[in-house]
UniProtKB/Swiss-Prot annotation:
PROSITE patterns: SSB
Organism: Helicobacter hepaticus (strain ATCC 51449 / 3B1)
Molecular function terms from GO: single-stranded DNA binding
The UniProt record lists the keyword Transport: no
Gene that produces this protein: ssb
Protein name (database record): Single-stranded DNA-binding protein
Record's keyword terms, sorted: DNA damage, DNA recombination, DNA repair, DNA replication, DNA-binding
Pfam families assigned to the protein according to its UniProt record, in alphabetical order: SSB
Length: 170
């Protein structure tokens, strides 16, 4: 089955960072995502979804270094169900997201202080990708731009290529 979650929201608390016995970093964050909609009576409604997110490796360390309560981020990952027994013996469960990539959406702060120094950050944020292995992490910077999809330094006059569909190998 396909399990993919993409969510944008704001941190509900500061990042909680700890290290696993293997030495890999694990960060837990709370995320709130708002949805505004029009009710049947025409008034505006809003619902908020709260969910915990787990980040591993370098992404966890970057989140701890740069994110604070209220920071806006985009998370791509997979939905997980955690189950446990509480102190009274009752079975409890909750959904969490295990992050595979994180993108900071807040712009750089103005003034002399720049917490993004010595990183691959741009005005639109920073993106970190991780796979499930704590020992394998990749960092990619996002291209410079105004953050809108479909913009950038792309050629304007792209010639049309005449290829028969049977020549395409897939």
């Amino acid at each position: 089955m396909y399990n993919k979650v993409i969510i944008i929201g704001n941190l509900t608390r500061d990042v909680e960072l700890r290290y696993l016995p293997s030495g890999s970093a694990l960060a837990t964050i709370g995320l709130a995502s708002n949805r505004r909609f029009k009710k049947q009576d025409g008034s505006q409604g809003e619902e908020v979804c709260f969910i915990d997110v787990k980040l591993f490796g370098r992404s966890a360390e970057v989140a701890n270094q740069y994110l604070r309560k209220g920071s806006k981020i985009l998370i791509e990952g997979r939905l997980s169900l955690e189950s446990w027994n509480d102190q009274s013996g009752a079975k409890r469960s909750r959904h969490t997201i295990t992050a595979e990539s994180m993108q900071m959406l807040d712009s750089k702060p103005s003034g002399d202080e720049n917490p993004y120094n010595n990183t691959n950050a741009s005005n639109t944020g920073m993106q970190h990708n991780t796979n499930n292995s704590p020992n394998y992490n990749q960092t990619h910077s996002q291209p410079q731009g105004n953050g809108n999809i479909g913009t950038g330094n792309y050629p304007q006059n792209i010639p049309e290529i005449n290829i028969d569909d049977e020549d395409i190998p897939f």
